[in-house]
């Protein structure tokens, strides 16, 4: 039997080479069969490519996919089942926003509160994405894998067997073998032809099941985007409220502290009873102490006043009507805050507007 099988394989190989190299004509199948073969070949490529691209669609980061595959392989070798979920980008961004929102402090910062709200929304979207992954894998990828490993594999097996029996039949006819051998080869050829045709027909005419799987895919995507839209709609409303809250909050005035305010010890920040720095003798130098310079002296005096005022840090030359010009170290009485960048004030009997960046507030407006 072994020798007979080997001889048959040699005869089929001989027939194949004769057809390819010698120009011998083999049995031709009809156009309908060849069209089914073409569509089946396309289906084989489709199922393989569709699985690959769907996985890339659900998990687009190739580095993360490679890491997950490596962990899975190591787990199999070690005999330990170790789960490793794909890091959704929404989840990574959520973690970043939540972490730094909490570090900033939610009690005093509307921005920190908004970050936390945004992070929580992204976290919900990541959970919805995981549900989408599970749905697609179960209802779309698994049926494709089943088709690839069962239906397509069976059809391709019948086609391969048909090709071998066709070569055996043509070889026996070309060599003018005995009638019973030719008849036996023809019967087997006909049997394989029928199995291959039926298998390809059933595969190609199963549109209802294939389209149903696409419907499931589309429904899963629709549900995913609908849930994400609901989450984002709620987030947008919350952030609008946070923005209104931030706009309605009174702006805090900030007066930078000087070394005198800090009352530093040891490094020269302390003062003697006469107001001179403790580490400098009154006769140590004829030059005035920086802490007693006119600019600093003027900076201290207005703080004792009740009237809102500021000290000019630089010269300001007005360029437009209504602006108030002044010189460095001038003390300007604050009358009104125009906006975040401009004040209204008076100095030397003149009144006008001036930029906030040119002054240091000594006594803030009430």
UniProtKB/Swiss-Prot annotation:
Biased composition (Low complexity): 277-294
Cellular localisation: Cytoplasm; Membrane
Lineage top rank: taxon: Eukaryota
One cellular component term from this protein's GO annotations in UniProt: cytoplasm
Major localization listed first in the record, in broad terms: cytoplasm
Molecular-function GO terms, alphabetical: phospholipid binding
GO BP of this protein: autophagosome assembly; cellular response to starvation; clathrin-dependent synaptic vesicle endocytosis; membrane bending; membrane tubulation; plasma membrane tubulation; regulation of synapse structure or activity; synaptic vesicle endocytosis
InterPro entries from the UniProt entry: AH/BAR_dom_sf (IPR027267), BAR_dom (IPR004148), Endophilin_A_SH3 (IPR035824), Endophilin_SH3RF (IPR050384), SH3-like_dom_sf (IPR036028), SH3_domain (IPR001452)
SH3 domain location: 305-364
Protein name according to UniProt: Endophilin-A
């Amino acid at each position: 039997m072994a020798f007979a099988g080997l001889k048959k394989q040699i005869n089929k190989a001989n027939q194949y080479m004769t057809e390819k190299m010698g120009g011998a004509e083999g049995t031709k199948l009809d156009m309908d069969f060849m069209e089914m073969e073409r569509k089946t070949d396309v289906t084989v490529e489709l199922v393989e490519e569709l699985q690959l691209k769907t996985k890339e669609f659900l998990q687009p980061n190739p580095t993360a996919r490679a890491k997950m595959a490596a962990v899975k392989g190591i787990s199999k070798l070690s005999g330990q089942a170790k789960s490793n979920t794909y890091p959704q980008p929404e989840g990574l961004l959520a973690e970043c926003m939540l972490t730094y929102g909490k570090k900033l402090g939610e009690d005093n910062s509307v921005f920190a509160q908004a970050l936390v709200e945004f992070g929580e929304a992204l976290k919900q979207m990541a959970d919805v994405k995981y549900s989408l992954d599970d749905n697609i894998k179960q209802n779309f990828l698994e049926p494709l894998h089943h088709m690839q490993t069962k239906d397509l594999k069976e059809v391709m097996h019948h086609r391969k067997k048909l090709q071998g029996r066709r070569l055996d039949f043509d070889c026996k006819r070309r060599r003018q073998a005995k009638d019973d051998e030719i008849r036996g080869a023809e019967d087997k050829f006909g049997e394989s032809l029928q199995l291959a045709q039926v298998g390809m027909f059933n595969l190609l005419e199963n549109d209802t099941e294939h389209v149903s799987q696409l419907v499931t895919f589309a429904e899963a995507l629709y549900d995913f985007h609908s849930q994400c839209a609901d989450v984002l709609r709620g987030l947008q409303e919350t952030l609008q409220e946070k923005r209104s809250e931030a706009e309605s909050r009174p702006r805090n005035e900030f007066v930078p502290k000087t070394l005198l305010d800090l009352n530093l010890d040891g490094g020269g920040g302390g003062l003697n009873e006469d107001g001179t720095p403790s580490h400098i003798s009154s006769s140590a130098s004829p030059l005035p102490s920086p802490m007693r310079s006119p600019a600093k002296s003027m900076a201290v005096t207005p703080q004792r006043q009740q009237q809102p005022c500021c000290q000019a840090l630089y010269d300001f030359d007005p360029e437009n009507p209504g602006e108030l010009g002044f010189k460095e170290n001038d003390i300007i009485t604050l009358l009104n805050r125009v906006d975040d960048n401009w004040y209204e004030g008076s100095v030397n009997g003149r009144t006008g507007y001036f930029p906030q960046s040119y002054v240091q507030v000594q006594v803030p407006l009430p």
